[in-house]
Every structure is written in structure tokens, then in C-alpha cells.
């Protein structure tokens, strides 16, 4: 779906910018000069949340209370309403969205809000075979204080499909991106891993990419058929804290994770 795949970048005081997929992996970390690092602290805080197209009350309160202190906010089903765009541009240097499909007024898809400008941006889309609706993913790269580059993958996986062929197919280009990146990685989002074959495919992919799963002690993640849908995977970082915020502001609960970019745990 490369033809209709693009990202829209929202920056305060500037018109929205359309960004097309890069033509080669060689541009990872070379497309733009590294600017200010994502965090000046010895920690990176992220919020991961399927925001349910902002259909429920209190979604903005949750973002204001928990997103404003995060260096990265990875949203799925984010609809670019004026309220969300205003929050994003007022609190973050950049907000990149990959429209999965266009609703009557505003596009909906994954959206990554970041405290630094990405030096690389690659939008991805995959169409669900049954409903013919697209799901999107976004790969962005940010400089860290230790000069390493952090790759961030925001994923909303296909939901309605027979078997796992389309599910695994969506992971392939993500794997290509990660395989061409030597630095730390965070991959997170709504993976719709509601069946054992999907869960196995996701875990197999994580192993192949040398990604570890963030564990939540009080695990209040949204579940379907007894299996969690939202995940955070990582490599080259340490996990300091991980929690799940219970809220009625969406049909998913936000995940809050704090990483330190120091020497990764063994």
C-alpha cells in the first residue's frame, strides 16, 4: 500500500507537512542532522494508548495529566481533531500521524508525539482483508543524549483476518526497518494479539528482532479472549518503571513505561 502511504507532521506555527516513505534504509539516521536529544535526563518516559478515536469523554484529561510529562506518546486510532492537534503541538515539538483511513472529517491512524524532532520517518500501512480497512504503523528515529539513535515503532496491527498470514505480513516491513538499525528500539502499540497463533507470531517476531517484552506487575491491559492486546517491546535500554492506567476514557488502558538509556540489562 505504498502508493497511498504517507505521514502528516504537525508542528506548532507551521502548516501540516506530508512525508512520504523513504526510498532506502540508508537514510536511517542520515536524512536530517541530529538536533536536540529526545531527553536531557537519564530516563525516557513513554505513554502508549489506543485512544478509540477520542469517542469517549476525559481522553484529553488523561493526555494532559499523564502525557505532558512523557517524552513520547504513541497513540493508536488517533483522529486528527483540532483538540488533539492543539494538544500535540502545544506540548510536543513534533506530532507524526499515518492516516490509516479517512473518516468523514478527520483522518484516523497511529500518531507519535515527541519531545524532539525525528531524524527519520517511515509510514507503513496494511489493509485488513475482510473489512478492507487499513491499519497503520510508524517508524521514527530520535537522537539520545549519549549520541545513539533511538528507533520508535508505533503499531496498530490488523484485527480481522483469517489465519495469521496478513498479520505476519504487516510485521515484515517493520522487521526490515529494525534489522537495519543498530541502536536501541522501542516497539509498542495495539497488536491485536487476541489468538494463540497471533500471539505466537508476535513473540516469534520479537525474538527474531532481539526485543524484550515490558512486564506489568498489576496488569490491567485490555484483553480479548483472555489475551492482552497492547504491548511494549524494547532493546538496548533498561526498564525503570512500568504501569497500566485504568480509565474509562477509551476501550483500552494506557501503558506508562520509563526507560533509562544506560547500559542495557543482560
Swiss-Prot record:
It is found in: Cytoplasm. Keywords: Cytoplasm. InterPro entries: Endo/exonu/phosph_ase_sf (IPR036691), Endo/exonuclease/phosphatase (IPR005135), UPF0294 (IPR022958). One of its GO terms (cellular component) is cytoplasm. One of its GO terms (molecular function) is catalytic activity. Its main location: cytoplasm. Belongs to the UPF0294 family. This is UPF0294 protein YafD. It comes from Salmonella dublin (strain CT_02021853).
